[in-house]
Amino acid sequence: MYELILALGWDLLLGEPPAVVHPVVWFGKLIAFIDSHYSRRSPAIDFLAGLFATLVVLSFAFLLSILPLYAPYPLNYLLSVYLLKSSFAIRSLYEHVRRTMKDDVEEMRKEVSMIVSRDTSKLGREHLISASIESLAENTNDSVVAPLFYYLLFGLPGALVYRAVNTLDAMVGYRTSRYEYFGKFSARLDDILNFLPARITVLLFLPLNPRRVIRYYKMARFKVNSDKPIAAMSAVLGIWLEKPNIYRFPGRDPRMEDIERALKVYVIVVSEWILLLLLGVIL
């Protein structure tokens, strides 16, 4: 339990460790190295190469997670807390989303582009606000609920391996000519691992507007985990959230102050999750 409490305290008080010593950054560099050194071939070979890349990255994550077992006291305790903290990002997510609140549209586009994969160069203010809030909702699962869910189930290996899978999906899990087959295995694995956490995230939104959250949840695409927390956030805020030509949850037009409202919802949801985690560890 000390490990979880200290890791949460580190995150809330200090935020992220420097990139040069951040395990998730290491995962990203390893993925980028493998990706850049593999020349695409046939679909079958690309799929096998992607499978191999996934196994390499997950093996690295697992080896990192067991380092504390072989470290001397008290380094083992410090390593455990440090590695667990690196698997989730409560404060960092809050700060990144808050920085998108810019009066100047061009500045806002730049900030939003840092937290979403879509092209923001031609998005209007309402769609920029929507994209910012969508990212907050989706990453409430990916960066907070899911890694700590797998920590609760499998300890430090669960948290770091999940984070490695999520990083793989974020980097190569796209349906493009380059990644369609190379990223398929890691994308499907990410879908499987996020199935339960995404729905747990929705349950955390439920007390804020039960009837509407349930109604919006039913609108979300069944097979797409990321839709679920976005639908829940849209329901609670009462605004439309939209990725053009992909999905749209109904409501009034989003306004700048809705980002602030979304951040308050995020604080409530994360607080609920932390409380449940601590109760789970105690019991």
Curated annotation (Swiss-Prot):
| Location within or outside the cell | Cell membrane
What membrane topology does the UniProt entry give? Multi-pass membrane protein
GO BP annotations of the record are: cobalamin biosynthetic process
Major location (coarse): membrane
Q: In which pathway does it act?
A: Cofactor biosynthesis; adenosylcobalamin biosynthesis
One of the entry's Gene Ontology molecular-function terms is: ABC-type vitamin B12 transporter activity
Question: Which controlled-vocabulary keywords does the entry list?
Answer: Cell membrane, Cobalamin biosynthesis, Membrane, Transmembrane, Transmembrane helix
Annotated GO CC locations: plasma membrane
Write down the InterPro entries for this protein, in alphabetical order: Cobalamin_biosynth_CobD/CbiB
Q: Which domain of life is it from?
A: Archaea
> What residue intervals traverse the membrane?
5-25, 47-67, 142-162, 263-283
Q: Residues of the signal sequence?
A: none
Q: What does this protein do?
A: Converts cobyric acid to cobinamide by the addition of aminopropanol on the F carboxylic group.
Instruction: Read off the HAMAP family from this record.
Output: CobD_CbiB (MF_00024)
Which PANTHER family does its entry note?
COBALAMIN BIOSYNTHESIS PROTEIN CBIB
Entry similarity comment: Belongs to the CobD/CbiB family.
Q: What is this protein called?
A: Probable cobalamin biosynthesis protein CobD
Provenance organism: Pyrococcus horikoshii (strain ATCC 700860 / DSM 12428 / JCM 9974 / NBRC 100139 / OT-3)
Q: Which classification does the entry list for the species?
A: Archaea, Methanobacteriati, Methanobacteriota, Thermococci, Thermococcales
